Amino acid sequence: MSLKELGDVSYFRLNNEINRPVNGQIPLHKDQEAVKAFFKENVLPNTKQFDSILDKIAYLLEENYLEKEFLDQYSPEFIIKIDQFLKDQNFRFKSFMAAYKFYNQYALKTNDGAYYLESMEDRVLFNALYFAEGDEELALNLANEMIHLRYQPATPSFLNAGRARRGELVSCFLIQVTDDMNSIGRSINSALQLSRIGGGVGISLSNLREAGAPIKGYEGAASGVVPVMKLFEDSFSYSNQLGQRQGAGVVYLDVFHPDIISFLSTKKENADEKVRVKTLSLGITVPDKFYELARKNEDMYLFSPYSVELEYGVPYSYLDITEKYDELVANPRIRKTKIKARDLETEISKLQQESGYPYVINIDTANRSNPVDGKIIMSNLCSEILQVQTPSVINDSQEYLTMGTDVSCNLGSTNIVNLMKSPDFGRSVRTMTRALTYVTDHSHISAVPSIEAGNERAHSIGLGAMGLHSYLAQNLIDYGSKTAVEFTNIYFMLLNYWTLVESNNIARERKATFHNFEKSKYADGSYFDKYVTGDYQPQSDRVKELFEGIFIPSGQDWADLREKVKVDGLYHQNRLAVAPNGSISYINDVSASIHPITQRIEERQEKKIGKIYYPAAGLATETIPFYKSAYDMDMRKVIDVYAAATEHVDQGLSLTLFLRSELPKELYEWKKENKQTTRDLSILRNYAFNKDIKSIYYIRTFTDDGEEVGANQCESCVI
């Protein structure tokens, strides 16, 4: 028997019985029966057996399944020790979905796909040995964090660590295009190369001259951004990771770009096929000035990137539109057109209703809270990566005359449910920071030199979180309540503190900091001021109870850290980012990211299998009232939770808004009828802006027929 000869199995049927209540009760025990049946019928008979871990490793090396170099850093005795430690933890998957996802997507299999070569303990073992790079204490600490599901590396890292025939450890990238053919050509090549390795790519088009702009003095010669969008879409479609999955990309455009209306129109259902983009995602960067003009119901001017760069000597993206707006309007040398700000606001809302796009990056908000030197101009495919970039200059031979910096995303996630049970919260986070540091140190995207240059200078990582709704519900706390907001604030403050501590430790050990550290708010100490003078201790009795036994830094602790950072610096330019979570949240048996669940019993359509049902983690009679669907919540409560986390996160958080096509009037005081309107979305975007939210990801609309609009999650960037 092999995985190719399974025959009739019972575990899918058992799992599907969860969705059939018996006498008003959800038969959750059927999911546990499905897990047992899955191991009995699928895993155990089809796992290749070995006498010992050393025998297994010898086989995996001989058959070219594992890299030899990382294993050579450890003695056989230590490998036996850490393997035994992992076995002693008695790890068990808590749901059928968790076990199925791990063995289907992550476990190493024989070349013919017939047999499993790894268990969860084995995958954790190889991750720990790989990321610890010969440090036995760190390897044991990492194994401890991962087997207890306190830390989860992002999918590309967890999947590929230690494998001989592996993909990259990262799968999320940001590149920018400047206003010349050499940059466009090089960027398309970069998109092809990144898509080939399974990457999701964010691309800024804001610097490109608009349709009708002059080229070499010839008026009306420029084609604008839409044809370039089509080139990128075709590139992602063509370069599809050995035919396994479609490439994925998002293009960003500033709302003051003259092509903004035609840019948005490419996603409309009734768009002409010549301009319609079907698979490319859209995002917009929104300066503060747009919100001001829309609020006042005034005209807004759109400015030609070509004339802006001629006048100011920098690409359009690097100009502060809010600061320079009046100056640009008054300058006769700046080509401009005029539209009504509220008309554009309505167009954005219409498209979000129809497709879930565009993503929204509040670019001035992102830059105001950016503590490092430079300018954030865009984001990634999931809108949580916000890092400074610099433009490149490329000659006719496609060589770099000036090497700019672009971005790769080195991601991992804390599991809130389990990290809150850690015997040492701080040590756990410091260990995770070390694991992510390995990823940034060993990520070399040589096919795109600007990304490699950015990574080498910044050493950026993105530690995030998942399982917030699970944690709150299991502690009988309503998502979005004052208690939930206060908990979120303290939790992310702690992530901020401990990643700073460890980044400072690494900088001291290596005598190295990120590029331009001395120009940052960390170096002059101003970043720490609010923590030194403010009160970030738990206030309510309930939150004090939740954090009982967990160290909460005082103002003096922050002051001490400030002095250490001023002396020795930080290794990482960026440390925190909250991505959406895909498969890894199922393996961890918690709710995805920090947003609410959408269903108590989630229905997933798996390729070649059919429906699998996943009960919310910790679902029980007493927790059911606290597992309220996101579609039945006031989205302002979700925004409030994200705002509490945002204060402490140096990058962004992937914030999805969930709305029904028929909105209950009682949810929103401005509603006079149930139908969702463009005004609803405009009000919520403005609420998010006023709460200092940096980015909004999808708008997911649940329709009367049970379909979701805007729910086509990208595989390349959910971690």
PLM features: residue spans?
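Extended catalytic cores of very large enzyme megasubunits
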Residues: 1-719
